[in-house]
Amino acid sequence: PGVTGPVAVADAFATTWSRGAAFDLRRGMAMMVFELRQVRRPTGVSGQPRWARPEEVDLLADWVDAFNVEVHQTPRPSLEQVRERVLERIHSQNVLVWEDEGRPVSLASRSRPSPRGTAINCVRTPPAYRRRGYASACVAELSQRTLDDGKLFCTLFTDLANPTSNHIYGEIGFESRGEFVELHFD
């Protein structure tokens, strides 16, 4: 159990919740929440975007599972649970793949739609394909498609300890809106 939210709110909740309790409070990931209202697409990135296909579910589920490991997802869903979620998102056109030379090289998905916005999440480029701009191009394209669908904005959470991703998302047009924190009750 735990809480995730804006730093001041999460800290206040944790302090109140833990009064007289027999558990330790552990800080998890420090995050930045970003908002995008206008996309700046990267240039010079090889490949093209497309919606993920059902026959790719096993490959993409492996990528999402690896993403969950990298971000220390707690609790971590089973690979079968990941596969089911990925397939649901594929069928609802919520997983975008960046493809280069006929093969998927990056993915980004979207979730938590509201009347005005949608969250971009689970951005993953396998290590062999990193540092080529694929993730930036994929996120920019998915964000633009989301805006084209009538949403006013996209949101995205990043790990504050990863300056590379924070910089990349800023280049695409995401603007920081505040720090969030995960707090765990052990």
Regions found by a protein language model. Name each.
Residues 4-10, 156-166, 183-186:
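Conserved beta-strand-loop-alpha-helix junction that forms the acyl-donor binding cleft
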Residues 74-124:
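A conserved beta-strand-loop-helix scaffold within acyl/acetyltransferase catalytic domains
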